[in-house]
Amino acid sequence: MAGDFYDYARIFVQAGDGGDGAATFRREKYVPRGGPDGGDGGRGGHIYLVADPGLNTLLPFRERTRFVAERGGNGGRSRKHGRNGRDVFIRVPVGTVARTIIDGETYTVDLDAPGLQLLAARGGRGGLGNVHFATSSYQVPRIAELGEPGERREIELELKLLADVGLVGFPNAGKSTLLSVISAARPKIAPYPFTTLQPNLGVVEVGDYSFVVADIPGLIEGAHRGVGLGFSFLRHIERTRLLIHIIDAAGVDGRDPVGDFHAINEELRLYQPELAQRPQIVALNKADLPEAQANLSRLRHALPLPDHDVFVISAATREGVDALLQRVAGRLKEMPAPHRVPRDETLTWPVPDVDERQYTIERTSDGWRVRGRKIERLISMTNFAQPDAIMRIQRVLEASGISAALQEAGIQNGDTVYIEKAAFEWEDGEITYLMPGVR
């Protein structure tokens, strides 16, 4: 990976509001009393997240964090339908996990295959024109709906690299050097800790078999709590099928190779217990140094792994590297392959289905609060400047049982009823709209 690497971002998305319906009537030369002909508003633009295999970082979201889709067009005369707002497509790397909070619950969608789309925010429905409200007893409907507001969401994006093999170990153990000799990747390499400050990917070919290796920046004790480079990089190990645990067998700078092995595995366990059970192959690196040769016998006996999963290598001279790769390829072939084929599929937030007709009534210090998806949507799409708007709301409150429920709860004349952002005064079962600021 070249350039800066960002694997976390927060964005705000705002889908387009629906267009307003029209409250118009036919005006034709020989039709003196033409009926309603107001058209519907267009749908607001949706906002999608799209998994793009050509991206490998969330860097673009460092500069741009807000995305707004277009509003739907208004309806017009002669039943003219407003045009739909243009959709917005936000491209993210394959392997991006999206999270949002809806009604107090956190929902997660994993964009782990090329082409997957997430409908991140749904555009509002266009308002109905007055042609929909005409009946035999109500032939001159002076009402049309406003467009429904588009969904607004704060979304957390987290990139988890898609790699078959993860290179783990303490800083300066030789992970980047190994990646550079087994693949075409060219990570920054220097003889001091924390040279690698971002994950690097490389494709390794063993005969006619290939796999992807991720060089994870060096871990230290306390990484599961965010110490050092911390859990911001541990997340990239989660999707790997196999770990190559690289140990500095020479014990440079007085390090204990056996202690390092156990310390790294403990960090993996504390971060995510399943990671400690992930298949591992150990590479005892720096075998070209005399100090390593003196430690090899002790290390082989101290490591709780079979001999066929412990390899003595020198990434600097390539000693033992080919044998290591053959073993890695063999282990991967024995494991189930991940299903990452392109998928032309649109996902939605996994929100449970609910009956939108349900509602709740709460007694508050200054009145009554009615909540419910259907009734709140009706209020948000009501143009209170239109003469017949209150009449429609009154009918819906009665038909839905809300009026009866309020009376059963003990509402009194003069009490205020709040629904969504609107306030109404209750009087003998009928409501009067209170302009904002009026009590």
Swiss-Prot record:
Name the Gene Ontology molecular function terms of this record. GTP binding; GTPase activity; magnesium ion binding
Q: What is this protein called?
A: GTPase Obg
Taxonomic lineage from the root = Bacteria, Bacillati, Chloroflexota, Chloroflexia, Chloroflexales
| Family assignment from sequence similarity | Belongs to the TRAFAC class OBG-HflX-like GTPase superfamily. OBG GTPase family.
Names of required cofactors: Mg(2+)
Q: Where does Mg(2+) bind?
A: 176, 196
Q: Which GO terms describe its cellular component?
A: cytoplasm
Q: Which residues bind GTP?
A: 169-176, 194-198, 215-218, 285-288, 314-316
Major location category of this protein: cytoplasm
Recite the UniProt keywords alphabetically. Answer: Cytoplasm, GTP-binding, Hydrolase, Magnesium, Metal-binding, Nucleotide-binding
User: What the protein does?
Assistant: An essential GTPase which binds GTP, GDP and possibly (p)ppGpp with moderate affinity, with high nucleotide exchange rates and a fairly low GTP hydrolysis rate. Plays a role in control of the cell cycle, stress response, ribosome biogenesis and in those bacteria that undergo differentiation, in morphogenesis control.
Obg domain span:
3-162
Pfam families to which the protein is assigned, alphabetical: DUF1967, GTP1_OBG, MMR_HSR1
- EC number(s) given by UniProt: 3.6.5.-
* Compartment annotation: Cytoplasm
Any idea where the OBG-type G domain is?
163-333
What is the uppermost EC class here? Answer: hydrolase
Gene Ontology BP term (one): ribosome biogenesis
CDD domains xref list: Obg
Could you tell me the gene encoding this protein? obg
Please list the residue ranges annotated as the OCT domain. Answer: 351-428
Taxonomic superkingdom: Bacteria
User: How does this protein assemble?
Assistant: Monomer.
Please tell me the species this chain comes from.
Roseiflexus sp. (strain RS-1)
